[in-house]
Every structure is written in structure tokens, then in C-alpha cells.
């Protein structure tokens, strides 16, 4: 049974979310809170498995409450956004920076044509967050260790042409770390698929640009791949590269692994376009999206990196890749930065 605490200043929203969640036999709503102060107290008293957190509340807002909870009684926090305007989405990513594990839009109410679908997705996502038993943070090293010597079969035979990264739950903070750590003269385009609820990608890219050494863009169909730029897959489209490897191709073909955009689609595409001249990176997240395709990328001669268990919020995707023998390296985020820099700067 997953124990959930609902935090929202609106009594009607609390009642709505409570009805959605309590209807699932695997969930028990153990309490509600109307502001951040109440939330901090309730977490300490009730010890929930998951907290759903509103952002805009009186007294202590959701951002401060998230920070306080993560300092005192760490628990998976899901930011629930009722309004996807720029200000609220920006605040949502500040809450993720403070320790929230993911963000979800609040489902539409009864009578809306999307209500049942959105409600099912919301409830399932909240339940899955209970798998995040401990919120981990990785140490920042002033002098990161150098990349271990590459095994012969992983040596890149020619100059690299692209980096492809896939991430899910816990990915935003890791991607922020990687993009902030790369040099401004990083000589490769970086292609990113981050699983995220619809409506948050624009704010996610804006948030990344606050700290990234590279310009970060929402990928557009036909965009030319420019070295030293990062491209994030947009909502509802698979992101591929053209056969000649010069541009981005967006496709609305069926979801893969239940997902669109899919990491699998990106990895398969870069394997075809670049082969061994790619670095593939699979970060924290649940499920197995991208794992088999990362193995194929390794078999093509590419360097393939997965995030280590200790620094992953959920080690599902990287763990599946390791089981398949898909990784040439298993590294924490700061050493992924070191590895990418070392590989890209090789002459």
C-alpha cells in the first residue's frame, strides 16, 4: 500500500486529488496539508511514501516546503502543476532542483474528454514514485578523476560526431550537471531525450539554459546539427537524425516502450547515422527504454556510458543496460562530464 500526502492550498483540489488517488486499491491517502508549513509537519508526523506538492501556497510555498522536507525528512515529492504557464513551470524546475523527483500536470476534471486517461496516468505515476525509497545526491568533486583507459573494442576509430543521451525519472538534475560541466567549446552536438509529462519541455529547456555552458534548444524538424549545441526532443515526437547525420528528423510514429519521444528511437537512429562515432549515455530512470539499443550502439563500436546505481534516483534504465552488457563505462554524473570532455577532445 502506497501512503500519499496531498499538499494544496485549494480545498477543492485536495478533495479532487484525494478522490482520484483513493480510488486505487494500492493507494492510501494518509493526510492532506493546505500550505508548506503544514506539509513539513505532516511529513514528519505521518511518514508518507509520496507527497504531491502544489507550488503556489500561502505562508510557506511549495518550493520552500520541498527544500525543507528534503533537508529534514527526505521523501519522494511529486510537483503537481495546475497551470502550465511559464512562471509556474519555472518554479516547478526550481523545486526539482531542491529535490522533487518529478512534475505532473493536474488531471482535467470529470466531464472533460481527457479526464479518465489523464487520471489513470497521474495515479500510476504517483504509485511508481514510491519506488524511490531514498533521494540520493552525488558528491561534487573539485578535481574529478580522469576517465579510465578505454578497452580496445571501445576505441573510437575516427573523430566523434555526436553525443546521444536518454533519461527519465531523476534525469533533469543529472542533465543540468552534465550540460553545466561541459566546456563552451565542446565540439559535438548533444541530442537529449528526457521522459517528461506533456507541457513541461519548454520550461525544462529554459531552466537548463540558466546554467548550461552550451546553448540548449527544443529540437525542430530539419534543424541542422551544430557542434556545441544541445537539442532536447519535443513533446510527442520521436527525435532522430537524418541518414547523412546533418540534421534532426522528428517523427510521430507510434510510441516505443509506451513512450514518445523514446530513447530507443534516438539510439537506433544515431547508430545508423554515426555508428562508432557516437557516444551513447543512458541516465537514471524507470523501465528499459534505450537499453537494447545502447547495446547495439556498443556492438557498432561506440563508447557507451550508463549512470551508476549510487547516483541514480531509479536505476531501471541503466540497470537494464548493464544486464545486457550494453555499457563500456558505469559512471556518476561528474565523471560522465569528464568522460565526454576527454572523448570529444581526442584528436
From Swiss-Prot:
**Compartments in which it is found:** Cytoplasm
Query: Does Chloroplast count among this protein's keywords?
Result: no
Q: Which residues carry this modification: 4-aspartylphosphate?
A: 54
Which Pfam families does this UniProt record tie to the protein? CheB_methylest, Response_reg
- Name the principal localization, coarsely classed: cytoplasm
**Does Phosphoprotein show up as a keyword for this record?**
yes
Catalysed reaction per UniProt?
A: [protein]-L-glutamate 5-O-methyl ester + H2O = L-glutamyl-[protein] + methanol + H(+); L-glutaminyl-[protein] + H2O = L-glutamyl-[protein] + NH4(+)
Stated family = Belongs to the CheB family.
The name this protein goes by in its record = Protein-glutamate methylesterase/protein-glutamine glutaminase 4
The top of its lineage is: Bacteria, Pseudomonadati, Thermodesulfobacteriota, Desulfuromonadia, Geobacterales
Amino acid at each position: 500500500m502506497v501512503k500519499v500526502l496531498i499538499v494544496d492550498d485549494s480545498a477543492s483540489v485536495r478533495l479532487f486529488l484525494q478522490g482520484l488517488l483513493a480510488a486505487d486499491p494500492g493507494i492510501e491517502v494518509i493526510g492532506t496539508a493546505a500550505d508548506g508549513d503544514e506539509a513539513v509537519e505532516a511529513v514528519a508526523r505521518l511518514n508518507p511514501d509520496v507527497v504531491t506538492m502544489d507550488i503556489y501556497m500561502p505562508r510557506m510555498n511549495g518550493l520552500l516546503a520541498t527544500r525543507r522536507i528534503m533537508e529534514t525528512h527526505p521523501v519522494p515529492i511529486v510537483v503537481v502543476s495546475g497551470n502550465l504557464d511559464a512562471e509556474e513551470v519555472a518554479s516547478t524546475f526550481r523545486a526539482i532542483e531542491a529535490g522533487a523527483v518529478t512534475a505532473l500536470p493536474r488531471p482535467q476534471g470529470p466531464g472533460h474528454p481527457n479526464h479518465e486517461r489523464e487520471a489513470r496516468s497521474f495515479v500510476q505515476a504517483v504509485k511508481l514514485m514510491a519506488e524511490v525509497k531514498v533521494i540520493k545526491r552525488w558528491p561534487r568533486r573539485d578535481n574529478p578523476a580522469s576517465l579510465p583507459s578505454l578497452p580496445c573494442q571501445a576505441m573510437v576509430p575516427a573523430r566523434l560526431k555526436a553525443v546521444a543521451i536518454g533519461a527519465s525519472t531523476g534525469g533533469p538534475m543529472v542533465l543540468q550537471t552534465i550540460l553545466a560541466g561541459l566546456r563552451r567549446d565542446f565540439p559535438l552536438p548533444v541530442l537529449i531525450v528526457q521522459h517528461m509529462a506533456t507541457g513541461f519541455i519548454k520550461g525544462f529547456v529554459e531552466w537548463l539554459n540558466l546554467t548550461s555552458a552550451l546553448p540548449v534548444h527544443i529540437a525542430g524538424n530539419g534543424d541542422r546539427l551544430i557542434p556545441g549545441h544541445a537539442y532536447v526532443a519535443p513533446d510527442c515526437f520521436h527525435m532522430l537524425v537524418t541518414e547523412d547525420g546533418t540534421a534532426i528528423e522528428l517523427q510521430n510514429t507510434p510510441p516505443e516502450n509506451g513512450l514518445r519521444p523514446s530513447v530507443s528511437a534516438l539510439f537506433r537512429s544515431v547508430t545508423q547515422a554515426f555508428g562508432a562515432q557516437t557516444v551513447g549515455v543512458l541516465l537514471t530512470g524507470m523501465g528499459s527504454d534505450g537499453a537494447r539499443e545502447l547495446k547495439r550502439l556498443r556492438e557498432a563500436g561506440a563508447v557507451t556510458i550508463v549512470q551508476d546505481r549510487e547516483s541514480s534516483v531509479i536505476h531501471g534504465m541503466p540497470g537494464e543496460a548493464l544486464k545486457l552488457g550494453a555499457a563500456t563505462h558505469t559512471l556518476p554524473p561528474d565523471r560522465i562530464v569528464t568522460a565526454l570532455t576527454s572523448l570529444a577532445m581526442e584528436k
